[in-house]
């Protein structure tokens, strides 16, 4: 019996919607990254994007444990000397609630062209509304 290898044009992708209200950031991000990669499917192939589409709503209600709300820092750099910026989890959550989950999931996916294709299948929205009703996403309990 030969080892099965998925082909990119044969992959069946599902749409799922996840409610992030009162979920822990890291645990949610790990499961989302697993499903974006396609590791939950029996036809998973490392060099093919076999993952599903994930729509996440209510990301402004995400939480972190312990004192990470004040201690966790997000850094970015302008490219100029001394141009480093830092924000805490709370500051980033208040200003750009979607970015917190996007950054967490992106760090858990492979780097390179395949990882970039996987992160494009993640749709993150604050609030309970999303524009993907036409895809009829299934509710995914995490």
Curated annotation (Swiss-Prot):
Part of the 50S ribosomal subunit. GO terms for cellular component: cytosolic large ribosomal subunit. InterPro entries: Ribosomal_uL13 (IPR005822), Ribosomal_uL13_bac-type (IPR005823), Ribosomal_uL13_sf (IPR036899). PANTHER family: LARGE RIBOSOMAL SUBUNIT PROTEIN UL13M, RIBOSOMAL PROTEIN L13. This is Large ribosomal subunit protein uL13. NCBIfam families: rplM_bact (TIGR01066). This protein is one of the early assembly proteins of the 50S ribosomal subunit, although it is not seen to bind rRNA by itself. It is important during the early stages of 50S assembly. One of its GO terms (biological process) is negative regulation of translation. GO terms for molecular function: mRNA binding; structural constituent of ribosome. It holds the Pfam family Ribosomal_L13. Keywords: Ribonucleoprotein, Ribosomal protein. CDD domains: Ribosomal_L13 (cd00392). Belongs to the universal ribosomal protein uL13 family. The lineage of its organism: Bacteria, Pseudomonadati, Pseudomonadota, Betaproteobacteria, Neisseriales.
């Amino acid at each position: 019996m030969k080892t099965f290898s998925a082909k990119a044009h044969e992959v069946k992708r599902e749409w799922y919607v996840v409610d992030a209200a009162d979920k822990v950031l890291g645990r949610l991000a790990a499961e989302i990254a697993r499903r974006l990669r396609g590791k939950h499917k029996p036809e998973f192939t490392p060099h093919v994007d076999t993952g599903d589409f994930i729509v996440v709503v209510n990301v402004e209600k995400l939480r972190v444990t312990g004192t990470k709300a004040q201690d966790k820092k997000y850094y970015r750099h302008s490219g100029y000397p001394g141009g480093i910026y830092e924000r805490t989890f709370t500051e980033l959550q208040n200003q750009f609630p979607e970015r917190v989950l996007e950054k967490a999931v992106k760090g858990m996916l492979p780097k390179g062209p395949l990882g970039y294709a996987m992160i494009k299948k993640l749709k993150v929205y604050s609030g309970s509304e999303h524009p993907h009703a036409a895809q009829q996403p299934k509710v995914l309990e995490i």
